Amino acid sequence: FVHDGFHSCGACSFMGTASTMQIMAEALGLMLPGSALMPATSKDLRTVAREAGKQSVWLAEHDLTPDKIVTMKSFENAIMVHAAISGSTNSLLHLPAIAREFGIEIDGDTFDRLHRGAHYLLNIRPAGEWPAQFFYYAGGVPTIMEEIKDMLHLDVMTVTGKTLGENLEELKKNGFYDKCDSYL
């Protein structure tokens, strides 16, 4: 166990609840693109923390509140990402609870309906071979969303003040996916 355990600095190094819910927050549009599962030892951590702080101020100045970002469509996107990553089953409790806070009803049938059309794309422990930080280095949530974008609502708003579709296009234009290829 000592040699094969799931070692990590930060959140769990497997697709447990903490890792899954970071990914769900980003998939809902509530985190900056590409920031979920950033390893605690990453040189980019401070930069992304500053960007998140600046973006929080921008969101307040522009009155872009979570209730203007989180919709049924954004939950459907998150559930599709959940299927693609084979996320923690605890999400079946957490996502409906979060949705309820926004006046949105999600139940097991919602997961079942959306998961039936989804593809499993990840090889992350415990169902797969690799630790969770590899997901981050391989492009994280944006890479998964790019792969399944035909199944997503690209018109949903995000914390960037742009739609999901605009975020994915900007990442592609800026070469985000190019730096991730060596991990895929």
Regions found by a protein language model. Give the residues of each.
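Catalytic or ion-coupling anion/metal-binding cores of large enzyme and transporter domains
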Residues: 1-184
